[in-house]
C-alpha cells in the first residue's frame, strides 16, 4: 500500500479530500470532481482523491479513495454511524498526507472541528460561513493556526458563491492597497423578492415564490432578518482588515420585529399585513424610476445593512432576478 501511494505521488500531486455534506453544494462538488478528474490528472498532474464522505448521520472513509459513481448508495449501505466529533477523530487517526477537509454543511458543530483538524495538519476549505463569521478571536485563531502550520484555511464561497471576491481582496491588500469602503448586494434571495414584487404580486407572495424556487430558507425569516447578509459583510470587513463582530453591524430592518416572533405558521399568516404598505412604497419608487435593493455597506470598519432605493444610475439598479 505504501509503495502504491508513493508511485501515485511520483506521477501526480495528490490531494486527499474529506467532504462533509452531500446536499446541493456537496453533491454538486462531488459530481464536478468525478467529471473533471481525468482532465485534472492529464493536464494538471493533480489527483483529487476523495477519502471521506459524510452526512449528518453517517461517514464513509477509505484511504484508497471512494468510487464517486455510487457514493450515495455506499454511504447509505456501508457508512459508519457518525457525528462531527467521531468524524474528526477518525480523520485525525487516518493521518493522511496532504489532506483537506471540505465543509459543505451549514453546521456550527462541524465548524467547531476546524481548530482540531488544523492542529493535526489538515487544511480546511469551507462553504460553511459559521467559522469565518464567528467571534473575531476564533476567526483570527484559525487564520493564525493555518499560517503557523503552513496549511490552508479557505472560505472563498462564503461570499459571492463562485466569484473570487475574497481572493481579489487579499491580492489587493497583499499588494499594498487599503480597502476603505465596500458596498454590495449580498442576498440573492432578497434581491429575487424585491425584483418579483409588482402590482400583481404582493410582498408576501414574492416570499412564497422565493421559497418555492429554492432561493429562500425553509424558514424565510432567516433571509428577511438580514442575518445571512450580516455574516457575509462581517467576513468581508475582516478580510479587509477590520476587527468587526456581528453585533457591531447596524441593522435597518424593513419588517417590524414582531414578524420574527412566534411560529412559522404565525409568520405566514401575519406577513400579509405588510402587503399594502410595500405596494404603496413600490408605486412611489416606480414613479421615481427607482428600485428596492438590500444593501450591505462598510466604511472604515463601520458596517450596516438595510433596504435602499436606487435609481438607474446606480450599479445595483440592473441586478435582475436573484443576481447579487
Model-derived regions: residue spans:
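ATP-dependent carboxylate/acyl-activation modules
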Residues: 9, 13-15, 313-324
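Short, small-residue-biased leader/transition segments that mark boundaries at the very start
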Residues: 1-8
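Rossmann-like NAD(P)H-binding beta-loop-alpha module
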Residues: 147-150, 154-213, 227, 235
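Substrate-binding/catalytic subdomain of NAD(P)-dependent oxidoreductase enzymes
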Residues: 196-197, 205-317
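N-terminal glycine-/serine-/threonine-rich beta1-alpha1-beta2 phosphate-ribose binding loop
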Residues: 11-119
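Rossmann-fold NAD(P)-binding glycine/threonine-rich loop
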Residues: 107-119, 129-155, 161, 166-169
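Conserved active-site and cofactor/substrate-binding residues in soluble primary-metabolism enzymes
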Residues: 20, 24, 28, 48, ...
Amino acid at each position: 500500500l505504501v509503495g502504491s501511494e508513493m508511485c501515485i505521488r511520483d506521477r501526480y500531486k495528490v490531494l486527499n479530500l474529506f467532504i462533509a455534506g452531500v446536499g446541493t453544494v456537496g453533491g454538486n462538488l462531488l459530481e464536478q470532481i468525478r467529471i473533471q478528474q481525468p482532465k485534472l490528472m492529464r493536464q494538471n498532474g493533480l489527483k483529487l482523491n476523495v477519502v471521506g464522505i459524510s452526512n449528518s448521520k453517517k461517514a464513509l472513509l477509505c484511504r484508497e479513495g471512494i468510487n464517486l459513481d455510487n457514493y450515495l448508495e455506499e454511504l447509505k449501505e456501508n457508512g459508519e454511524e457518525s457525528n462531527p466529533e467521531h468524524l474528526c477523530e477518525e480523520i485525525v487517526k487516518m493521518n493522511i498526507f496532504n489532506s483537506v477537509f471540505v465543509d459543505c454543511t451549514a453546521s456550527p458543530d462541524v465548524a467547531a472541528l476546524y481548530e482540531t483538524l488544523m492542529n493535526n495538519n489538515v487544511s480546511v476549505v469551507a462553504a460553511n460561513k459559521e467559522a469565518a463569521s464567528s467571534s473575531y478571536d476564533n476567526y483570527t485563531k484559525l487564520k493564525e493556526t493555518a499560517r503557523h502550520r503552513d496549511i490552508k484555511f479557505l472560505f472563498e464561497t462564503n461570499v459571492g458563491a463562485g466569484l473570487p471576491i475574497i481572493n481579489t481582496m487579499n491580492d489587493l491588500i497583499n499588494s499594498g492597497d487599503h480597502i476603505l469602503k465596500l458596498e454590495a448586494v449580498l442576498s440573492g434571495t432578497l434581491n429575487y423578492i424585491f425584483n418579483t414584487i409588482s402590482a400583481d404580486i404582493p410582498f408576501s407572495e414574492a416570499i412564497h415564490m422565493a421559497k418555492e424556487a429554492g432561493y429562500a430558507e425553509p424558514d424565510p425569516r432567516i433571509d428577511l432578518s438580514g442575518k445571512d447578509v450580516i455574516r457575509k459583510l462581517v467576513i468581508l470587513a475582516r478580510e479587509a482588515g477590520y476587527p468587526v463582530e456581528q453585533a457591531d453591524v447596524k441593522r435597518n430592518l424593513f419588517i417590524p420585529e414582531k414578524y420574527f416572533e412566534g411560529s412559522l405558521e404565525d409568520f405566514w399568516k401575519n406577513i400579509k399585513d405588510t402587503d399594502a404598505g410595500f405596494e404603496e412604497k413600490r408605486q412611489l419608487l416606480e414613479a421615481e424610476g427607482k428600485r428596492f435593493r438590500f444593501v450591505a455597506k462598510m466604511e472604515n470598519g463601520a458596517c450596516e445593512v438595510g433596504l435602499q432605493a436606487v435609481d438607474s444610475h446606480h450599479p445595483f439598479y440592473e441586478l435582475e432576478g436573484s443576481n447579487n
